[in-house]
Regions:
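Hydrophobic/aromatic-rich alpha-helical bundle segments in the mid-to-C-terminal region
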Residues: 127-131, 135, 145-193, 203-210
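Hydrophobic alpha-helical connector segments
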Residues: 66-105, 159-160
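Amphipathic alpha-helical packing segments from all-alpha helical-bundle domains
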Residues: 103-116, 120-150
Length: 210
């Protein structure tokens, strides 16, 4: 993707995250870029086309991050073996990388804020919010704990909620924080403690079975 196309996507996303999708016009996007609407339409057909490409870009980045962190890229139904092979060390690294990505990467942070802002106004935005920030991550971790740790679905679901609940909260805290670095440190610490507690409890359980 060329630089101009990337610039259009990021600029549009900034405006969507600040003003909302419906309230942002193609004229506003073009004006923020210092170009005419005619020039903008040479790259994207309309505002909807811009948004569709933003979502496509997020899907690409999502898969790339999972691949880089040695985590399952697809669903449990399609790649069950990838879930079984995943280590808790990899899950810990990935979780911290995800927090940094959703808060520190401008493209991802703006996308998150857009979905948070629009989830109650637009059914599609609500679905994307659930996919990327709520039910999607919770289900992903449930599947991971079920196969990687050999837990039943009920226990895996409880573990996933115990893990992801604080992480989800830290996203909201980060956005209004006077000291974002301190929030990042606290979020990373919470993730580390979760996996440390899991290892400790797992060792105790293993010893009691001997």
């Amino acid at each position: 993707m060329g630089k101009t196309k990337e610039d259009i996507l990021l600029t549009a996303l900034r405006l969507f995250a600040r003003d909302g999708y419906e309230a942002t016009s193609t004229g506003a996007i073009a004006g923020a870029l210092g170009m005419t609407k005619a020039a903008l339409y040479k790259h994207y057909q309309n505002k909807r086309d811009i948004f569709d490409h933003i979502v496509m870009r997020m899907e690409e980045l999502d898969a790339a991050r999972a691949r880089e962190q040695e985590m399952p890229e697809d669903t449990l139904e399609k790649t069950p073996e990838a879930y079984r092979r995943t280590t808790m060390e990899a899950a810990c690294r990935y979780s911290k990388a995800q927090f940094d990505y959703w808060t520190g990467d401008e493209f991802a942070a703006c996308f998150r804020r857009l979905l948070t802002l629009e989830q109650f106004r637009n059914e599609e935005m609500s679905r994307l919010y659930q996919q990327y920030l709520a039910a999607g991550p919770l289900g992903y971790m449930t599947d991971l704990f079920a196969l990687a740790l050999g837990r039943d679905r009920q226990e895996a679901s409880a573990l996933a909620a115990e893990f992801y609940g604080p992480m989800f909260l830290f996203y909201a805290v980060y956005d209004g924080a006077e000291d974002p670095a301190a929030v990042r440190k606290a979020a990373h610490g919470q993730i580390d403690r979760f996996f440390q507690n899991w290892r400790r409890n797992n060792e105790i359980s293993t010893q009691s079975e001997v």
